[in-house]
Structures are given as C-alpha cells and as structure tokens.
Amino acid sequence: MAVPEETEKKARDVNEKTALLKKKSATELGELATSINTIARDAHMEANLEMEIVPQGLRVLIKDDQNRNMFERGSAKIMPFFKTLLVELAPVFDSLDNKIIITGHTDAMAYKNNIYNNWNLSGDRALSARRVLEEAGMPEDKVMQVSAMADQMLLDSKNPQSAGNRRIEIMVLTKSASDTLYQYFGQHGDKVVQPLVQKLDKQQVLSQRTR
C-alpha cells in the first residue's frame, strides 16, 4: 500500500528537526567541554579532568591523582581545591537546559567493617558534589539522578587501588537521553507501571475464561 504524500512529508520534517536538534546539542556540548577545560586549566586541574562526548551527552570525569585527593581518604568531606572547581562549574552547567547525572566511584580498597563500605562512600561523595553545585547557584532540578557505583567500574582495572579509580563523574545528558531515562523509570508513575498492571489483569481474565 502506497504511503500518502502528506505522511511522507511529515516524516521528512520530523527527521530534519531531529537532525537539527542533534547538531545543536553536539555544538552546545562541544562549547561546554571547552568552557570546562578552561576552568580546569585555570585551577591547575588538567591532570584530574577527562571529558568525552558520547551518544548520551558529555561525560566529565574528575578524579584523584597521586598528589591530590578530591575528598579526605575514606570520607565524603570535600577538599578545598575540588570545592572551588565545582563552584566554578556550577554556572557553566546551569547555562544549558540539559539535565545532569552525578555518579561517585571508589577504588577497590575495602573497609574493615560492614557498617560503612564503598557503596556508602561513593554515594555520599556524589551527594557532596551535588550539594556544592547547588549551593553555588545551580538549580536543584538540574540534577536528574545521583548514583553510587562503589568499585564496580574501575578505570584502571589492573591496579584496583589506583588513585585514578576514585572519581566523580558528571554526565550532561542530551534531551533524548534524559527522555529515555524518564521513560525507563516511568515518569509520573503511569507510563510503565500502570500499563503493565493492566496487561497482567487482561491476562488473568483471559486465563479464567479458558478454564
């Protein structure tokens, strides 16, 4: 069956708009990366910073090195130089409409007791970073998610206790990536959970009818 000309035109328009949005997003993320790099250079933190543009957005890694730690060892207490960097970054992140995800990572050094472990530490450090960004003026609703990864995603897997594994990652999401995440968690509770409940109810009714 032939596709109506009007339908084809609408499809082309949608594709063109999508392409323009992707191009605009890539340009904005590139400019954001340049701004972040300038701030890190001025703070003499180039060695602590890595960035890459991925399909989901701009991935910003701020990590420890052998000379400086972002937090006191074994603690979520933030060090002054890292706090200064985050304060400088807050208005930069706020300059775009993009949502962000903040994730904490640790090395593989284990705690001596089970009361507090690397899961707690990585989560508390991510929350500390979020708090500094918000205190510096970044709106609370800019943060879409705060995550703890403990030592599950080591950058240097050959050296699990390496300083470079201790890091904070800030993902600046594209619009499509944040939309996907909203759908994944069922925004407003009616996009994922309710349809599934309705489907199960229908299956139960059909099962009863066939008995």
UniProtKB/Swiss-Prot annotation:
GO terms for cellular component: bacterial-type flagellum stator complex. Pfam families: OmpA (PF00691). Residues 58-176 form the OmpA-like domain. Coiled coil: none annotated. Transmembrane segments: none annotated. NCBIfam families: PRK06778.1 (NF005273). Belongs to the MotB family. This is Putative truncated flagellar export/assembly protein LafU. It comes from Escherichia coli (strain K12). The lineage of its organism: Bacteria, Pseudomonadati, Pseudomonadota, Gammaproteobacteria, Enterobacterales.
